[in-house]
Swiss-Prot record:
This is Small ribosomal subunit protein uS19m. PROSITE patterns: RIBOSOMAL_S19. It holds the Pfam family Ribosomal_S19. It comes from the Eukaryota. SUPFAM superfamilies: Ribosomal protein S19. The gene is RPS19. GO terms for cellular component: mitochondrial small ribosomal subunit.
Amino acid sequence: MARSLSKPPFCEVKLATNNSVTKIWSRRSAILPQFVGKTVSIHNGRIFIPCKISPEMIGHKFGEFAVTRKKPIHKKKK
């Protein structure tokens, strides 16, 4: 079933109330307008990826900006 359009965006309460957000483990939280201009570190499962929040990111999820998979490196033929 699809998500209803009448539901508000999800954001962890701790993120919305804290003014000094630096590390984010909640990748499912939506980016709100109050985060614009801040630099946050988003956890990708292994390390924290620094990311500066811009106005274009509002409404997206934090997890979209920290990839969790490595790109494959193929051997070159000699």
